[in-house]
Amino acid sequence: MRFLRENSLSIFFGVLLVGSLIGQSFAGLHQFNADALTHHESTYTWFRYVTSSEFGGDVMENWQSEFLQFSLYILSTVWLLQRGSSESESPEDLGLMSDKSQLVGRYAKRNSPPWAKASGPRRFLYENSLILAMTFCFFGSWLCQSVNGWRAYNHQQLEHKESTITWGEYWGNADFWDRSLQNWQSEFLAIGSMAVFTIYLRQRGSPESKPVGAAHDATGISN
């Protein structure tokens, strides 16, 4: 019970993720087969659909945009300021901050991670490990999107008796960039709105919000 309580946030979103993927697989299969019947093409079973490039491409489109959002957000909040937002550092804390405030090197505590106590490349990798992980996930999922999107695009071309293209050509194809950019703009809108909304709006008890009674121009504070 203690484990569930201490990890309830990650478990909650993990369950939502699995549930959403299952729901998407059935809804997507229904739509795919409906389109196939309209064009007098063969339909898919559920298993064939979830292992297809059509389903994989749709999933990766969403994943890569989420990882891009957080990669840019993590990096931009190091150097950029939004006055009054709980999502921004205070003006005096912008930048990489001091070793003392970051508890690294000789300022590390007894229970600090070992690499925070180290120096050189190990510390550099660890103090940038979050942005490195998010960036790796973004490029990995974007690469997977391109492969699945390319295969799905060529499958559609063959169904319509039209010429196929190479994977390299697909990177310059409007289909690839339409799929990418329509996801990116929604992520930029959401994260930008969050930064501005937290200036004036509150959610009692949430670490994503300032305390209810905090001034609108108070920057870099949260519950």
List PLM regions with ranges.
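Extramembrane terminal tails and long inter-domain/linker segments of multi-pass membrane proteins
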Residues: 1, 44, 85-121, 205-223
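Alpha-helical transmembrane segments and their helix-start/interface "positive-inside/aromatic belt" motifs
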Residues: 1-18, 120-136
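N-terminal first transmembrane alpha-helix
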Residues: 5-12, 16, 22, 36, ...
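Alpha-helical transmembrane segments of multi-pass membrane proteins
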Residues: 17-32, 141-145
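Interfacial/capping segments of alpha-helical transmembrane domains
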Residues: 26-43, 149-162
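Short, motif-level signal for alpha-helix interfacial/capping segments enriched in acidic residues
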Residues: 39-49, 95-96, 160-173, 214-217
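A structural feature that tracks compact, well-ordered secondary-structure segments
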Residues: 48-81, 86, 138-154, 162, ...
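Domain-level detector of nuclease and nuclease-like folds
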Residues: 105-140, 147, 152-153
